[in-house]
A protein has these predicted regions:
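FMN-binding flavodoxin-like domain, especially the glycine-rich phosphate-binding loop
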Residues: 28-70, 77-78, 83-181
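Boundary at the C-terminal end of the N-terminal hydrophobic targeting segment
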Residues: 22-27
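Hydrophobic h-region of N-terminal signal peptides that target proteins for export
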Residues: 14-19
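N-terminal secretory signal peptides and thylakoid transit peptides that target proteins
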Residues: 1-13
Length: 181
């Protein structure tokens, strides 16, 4: 079952996710840390919750006003169209005081070798100048794609650390590695 898979994955990922984080991210002050993520299938939510258990801080799911289709193929088409049009879906999620965070763990699935457009909306909606961004990515084999480049373009005055990249395949436990940054 999906719950059993996530429970087993959580045990596997717990140490992996924390140990794979850059040292600077491991020591982030919990009261100055935000874990923000977008998920479609729930995989990224699972990773975000594990990180939250390890580093503390505030945990926030970035939800678009208009959700993506629950049908996989329809979602893929919609995500591709959003990428091609550089869409910025409106988010119903609001961060009350973004200025209080120094470190932002940013989680998302790799969609079409980049960030999902709700992540672009989030990055454009707030000032990330001087903040440390720690990306964590769930994927089915595409690793980080061009997502770090996309984040760097949207947040040129931020420090972007190495990324945690976790692969999910149907019916298997996630496996992870560090990104190229």
């Amino acid at each position: 079952s999906r719950r059993r898979f996530l429970a087993i994955s959580a045990l596997t990922l717990g140490g992996l996710a924390f140990n794979a984080l850059p040292r600077s991210a491991r020591g982030a002050a919990p009261e100055r840390t935000l874990i923000a993520y977008f998920t479609w299938s729930g995989n990224t939510r699972g990773i975000a919750r594990l990180l939250h258990q390890k580093v503390g801080g505030d945990l926030v799911e970035l939800e678009p006003v208009t959700p993506y289709s629950e049908n996989y193929d329809t979602c893929l088409e919609q995500a591709k169209r959003d990428q091609e049009q550089a869409a910025r879906p409106e988010l119903k999620t609001r961060i009350a005081d973004m200025g209080r965070y120094d470190t932002v763990f940013l989680g998302y699935p790799n969609w079409w070798a980049s960030i999902p457009m709700p992540i672009a909306s989030f990055l454009e909606q707030y000032d990330f100048s001087g903040k440390t961004i720690v990306p964590f990515v769930s994927h089915g084999g595409g690793r980080l794609g061009q997502s770090l480049t996309a984040i760097a373009k949207l947040c040129p005055s931020s420090r972007i650390t190495e990324a945690l990249s976790l692969r999910y395949s149907r019916g298997s436990s996630p496996s992870g590695d560090m990104g190229d940054r």
